[in-house]
UniProtKB/Swiss-Prot annotation:
Its EC number is 2.7.8.7. The keyword Magnesium applies. It is found in: Cytoplasm. Its cofactor is Mg(2+). Belongs to the P-Pant transferase superfamily. AcpS family. HAMAP family: AcpS (MF_00101). It catalyses: apo-[ACP] + CoA = holo-[ACP] + adenosine 3',5'-bisphosphate + H(+). GO terms for biological process: fatty acid biosynthetic process. The lineage of its organism: Bacteria, Pseudomonadati, Pseudomonadota, Betaproteobacteria, Burkholderiales. This is Holo-[acyl-carrier-protein] synthase. NCBIfam families: acpS, pantethn_trn. Keywords: Cytoplasm, Fatty acid biosynthesis, Fatty acid metabolism, Lipid biosynthesis, Lipid metabolism, Magnesium, Metal-binding, Transferase. One of its GO terms (cellular component) is cytoplasm. It comes from Acidovorax ebreus (strain TPSY).
Length: 130
């Protein structure tokens, strides 16, 4: 049974401007530790790739927060929600802390799709209840 659906579109230019204004602090606020390491590595090789990586993660977390119906209210926090990839490359949500407990207690599972183009990153999330 579908518990919730969320979608988000993110303007990559706004993410670029936030990084220019706030530097690494912006990424450190939005990304979980594993994501932060990937972002730093991608940004070092090709800064634009780092910006797009951050934009897709931002968009995916927004879509997920809408699908679970919490928005950005506890226990949903940026850093407790991590976007990872399965070996196949499929994006998935990995939860931590109180958010992981909240999600598991409700018997929920998530399906996520992300995409990006030059100026936009978009995500679609479906959360199901067992």
């Amino acid at each position: 049974m579908i518990y919730g659906i969320g979608t988000d579109i993110c303007d990559v230019r706004r993410i670029r401007a936030s990084l220019a204004r706030h530097g690494d602090r912006f990424a450190e606020k939005v990304l979980a530790d594993g994501e932060l390491a990937t972002w730093r590595a991608r940004s070092a090789r090709w800064p634009e790739r780092g910006v797009r990586y951050l934009a897709t993660r931002f968009s995916a977390k927004e879509a997920f927060s809408k699908a679970i119906g919490l928005g950005l209210h506890m226990p949903m926090t940026w850093r407790h929600c991590e976007v990872a990839n399965l070996p196949s490359g499929q994006p998935t949500i990995v939860l931590h802390g109180a958010l992981q407990d909240w999600f598991a207690a409700r018997g929920l599972r998530c399906h996520l799709s992300v995409t990006d183009e030059s100026d936009y990153a978009a995500s679609f999330c479906v959360v199901e209840k067992d």
